[in-house]
Each structure stands twice: as structure tokens, then as C-alpha cells.
């Protein structure tokens, strides 16, 4: 009679590099695997999967080295198609932790995701409570309309907005170079002022000899456009999101170094 094998205590790294320890062995088809780094146990697994490193832990930061799926009801896909809230979560992490994207879009350098939002389950629950749609428009996750200059994606600072609203606050510092926002200096040293309207069209606002006068014209025009755009969404954006956006956008102050 052969001696029964007990592989309890056997260790191995999985394909992500996490340490695994067999904490219970009841034959090759029924083992429990402990992940000490995350204090989590995967139950009723096969020994062969352990040997091949194919056992995953839901707390491993597999998305841009930060985000993890966690445990809960929210899944990354359904019927082979990625869920909308998973795509939104991944895009948020990409903006904060993908160096290649930040080289193309420097405004995201220094941005972070709050600890809770690194957990896909928590983000997804927040998504379901706060996501809405405006017919015919693409929705985007914003972090700094409610709080100008904010660099952290968090539950209290983030809000979904139509792309038309979000585009009002896009910083195009790469395009304008060293010139202050809304203006460009011509060969004679004067300042030409242009500002996009609420539909993305760039309007010409004149030429001014001083930077201060040019900025004053741009600031007044831009702040008026911001108010007009949010007013146009009354009845289209549900409450309380509309009131929060309206308050923030009515109080938004354009600054020369934006």
C-alpha cells in the first residue's frame, strides 16, 4: 500500500510572481492555496494548476501595477464583451500610471487614484450609483471640474460629464507653447486671442497690445461660455449631478497659467 502524499506547505510563485503556499492538501484535485502577501486563500483548486502557476489572487495589482479586481459581484466582462464600468476603471488607471500615455498627455503627470478606487469592486459600485447618459453624447469620467486643479481620482471629486462639457476644460499647453492660455503672440509682439465656443469651434476675439488686456477678454468670454454650456444641460443631466456641475462651473475662474 503506497503512502498517502501530503503536499501541505509546498511553495511556488504563480505567473504574476506572487508567493503561493499549499495550506490544505486533500489529493491532487482538492487543495487550498494561501497567498501570504495578501492574506487570502484560494480554495478547492487542482494541484496541477498550482504547479503551472495558474492560480490567481483577486488582490494582485495586475492593472497598470496598481488596480486589482477584488472580490464581489462585479465582473470585468459579460458574454465575452468588456463591461462599461471595467473599461472606465482601466482608462482611469491608464491616465495615472501609464508613462507612455503621460508623454503624449503631460497634464496627467502626477495624477493618482485613491486607495479605494484601486479596488475594481468599489469603483464599480460607485459607477452604478453615479453613471448617467445624455442621449447622443459620449460620457467621460472627470476629476477636476468639481475641484479645479485636483489630481486625485476619488469618490467625492469624480463625476461623469458629457464630452462637450469635459472639452471646455482641456488644457492644450503643448499646442500653445509658452504663451498664456487663449492667446498667441505675433511677430509684432501683440497678442491674438481665440477661444473655442461650446461646440469646439475656435472664435477670433481680436488682437491686443498687452498680455493683460488679451487675457481679460479671453477670461470673460471663456467663463461666459462655460455658464452657457452647463445651462444648456438643464433637464438633460439628472440630479444631483446637474446641480453639482452647475455650481462648480458657475464658480469656475479662468487663470492665466491654466
Features from the language model and the residues they span:
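Short helix-coil boundary/hinge micro-motifs
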Residues: 1-42, 58-90, 94, 110-113
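Structure-specific nucleic-acid interaction/processing domains
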Residues: 18, 28-30, 34-42, 50-61, ...
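A short, sequence-level motif marking secondary-structure junctions
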Residues: 24-29, 45-53, 208-213
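An aromatic-rich alpha-helical recognition segment common to small helix-rich domains
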Residues: 33, 123, 183, 193, ...
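Surface-exposed loop/edge segments in extracytoplasmic proteins
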Residues: 39-42, 200-204
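Extended, polar beta-sheet/loop recognition surfaces of beta-rich domains
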Residues: 46-66, 165, 174, 225-258
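Short, cationic Gly/His-enriched loop motifs
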Residues: 76-98, 103-195
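A short, exposed loop/beta-hairpin motif centered on an aromatic-Gly-Thr core
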Residues: 109-115, 201-211
Amino acid at each position: 500500500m503506497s503512502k498517502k502524499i501530503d503536499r501541505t506547505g509546498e511553495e511556488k510563485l504563480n505567473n504574476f510572481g506572487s508567493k503561493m503556499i499549499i495550506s490544505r492538501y486533500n489529493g491532487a484535485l482538492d487543495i487550498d492555496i494561501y497567498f501570504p502577501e495578501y492574506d487570502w486563500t484560494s480554495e478547492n483548486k487542482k494541484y496541477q494548476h498550482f504547479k503551472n502557476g495558474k492560480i490567481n489572487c483577486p488582490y494582485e495589482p495586475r492593472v497598470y501595477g496598481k488596480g486589482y479586481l477584488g472580490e464581489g459581484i462585479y465582473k470585468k466582462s459579460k458574454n465575452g464583451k468588456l463591461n462599461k464600468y471595467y473599461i472606465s476603471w482601466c482608462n482611469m488607471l491608464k491616465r495615472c500610471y501609464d508613462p507612455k500615455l503621460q508623454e503624449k498627455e503631460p497634464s496627467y503627470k502626477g495624477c493618482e487614484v485613491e486607495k479605494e478606487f484601486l479596488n475594481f469592486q468599489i469603483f464599480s459600485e460607485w459607477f452604478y450609483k453615479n453613471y448617467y447618459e445624455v442621449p447622443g453624447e459620449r460620457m467621460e469620467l472627470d476629476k477636476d471640474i468639481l475641484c479645479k486643479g485636483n489630481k486625485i481620482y476619488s469618490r467625492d471629486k469624480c463625476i461623469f460629464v458629457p464630452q462637450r462639457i469635459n472639452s471646455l476644460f482641456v488644457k492644450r499647453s503643448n499646442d500653445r507653447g509658452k504663451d498664456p492660455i487663449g492667446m498667441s503672440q505675433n511677430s509684432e509682439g501683440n497678442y491674438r486671442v481665440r477661444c473655442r465656443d461650446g461646440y469646439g469651434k475656435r472664435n477670433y476675439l481680436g488682437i491686443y497690445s498687452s498680455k493683460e488686456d488679451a487675457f481679460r477678454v479671453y477670461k470673460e468670454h471663456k467663463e461666459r461660455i462655460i455658464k452657457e454650456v452647463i445651462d444648456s444641460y438643464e433637464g438633460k443631466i439628472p440630479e444631483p449631478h446637474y446641480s453639482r456641475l452647475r455650481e462648480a462651473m458657475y464658480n469656475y475662474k479662468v487663470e492665466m497659467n491654466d
